[in-house]
């Protein structure tokens, strides 16, 4: 299809919108590079999508997509073909450059998200909201591993991707590389996640791809467990409401701030 031609994806010719004045003198090694050609998704059985964002007031005000506060830094994809899973990270808004051409990535994602392939998210409302800021509509079927987890075990303390991945599919996030690079760039702990968009994609790519991989593995597991517990219909019913919940949240309600 139209995205198959070799992609002139690097946007190095474009003036970068972000300027990072604190480039470290010695950066951590990484051999990760973004894909030269956008991956073919048409024959995938299922796709996972996970966004990395600059969401500056997430903790105080909630997700910034509703008020256009922040931007999408990159999109991680997991494409499942039978037993094989291919993962990719498409950086489009990293501060220090190294991004792909965002209009290309946007067109590609529009095609993918409007297709009939099942799309898996972990906390879908968040990612769907941010995709909306890029003028991308996510067409059902939509699957959410957070919803699935809550149906399977309502007594858990937390439903974070990392802890669910470790507990259920033996696949957590490996943050060593990210933490090392983060320390060099001056970001640590909780501060690190919020500032990944300020770091070069070569450090964020492997971490983001892992998120997409864990999300897919988790869904594969949850799908079996939901079936086993006769919860498949209920799960689908709940997940089919996600576009409506998104529309309602996007519409918002009037609040008197006084």
Regions from the language model: what does each represent?
Residues 2-59, 68, 105:
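N-terminal accessory regions of nucleic-acid-interacting proteins
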Residues 17, 53-63, 232-258:
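Common nucleic-acid-contacting/processivity interface regions adjacent to the catalytic cores
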Residues 49-52, 78-80, 122-123, 251, ...:
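Generic beta-strand/beta-sheet core signal
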Residues 1-2, 219:
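Short amphipathic C-terminal alpha-helix that caps PH/PH-like domains
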Residues 17-28, 70-73, 79-227, 237-238, ...:
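Active-site-proximal helix-loop-helix substrate-binding element of RNase H-like nuclease domains
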